[in-house]
Each structure stands twice: as structure tokens, then as C-alpha cells.
Amino acid sequence: HSDAVFTDNYSRFRKQMAVKKYLNSVLT
């Protein structure tokens, strides 16, 4: 169970980082 939670949080974290990186590339 803990692995599933960790994977879910990690994928969510990766998505947030991808969105931030995308926004930075668009705004600059």
C-alpha cells in the first residue's frame, strides 16, 4: 500500500514539475 501511495504522489509531483517547466518555457 505504501508503495502505491508513494507512486501516486511521485507521479503527481512529476506532473506538477512538468507543468511548471512548460509554463516557464512558454512565458520566457
From Swiss-Prot:
Gene3D superfamilies: 6.10.250.590. The keyword RNA-binding does not apply. Pfam families: Hormone_2 (PF00123). GO terms for cellular component: extracellular region; neuron projection. Transmembrane segments: none annotated. The keyword Transmembrane helix does not apply. It is found in: Secreted. Belongs to the glucagon family. This is Vasoactive intestinal peptide. It comes from Alligator mississippiensis (American alligator). The lineage of its organism: Eukaryota, Metazoa, Chordata, Craniata, Vertebrata. The gene is VIP.
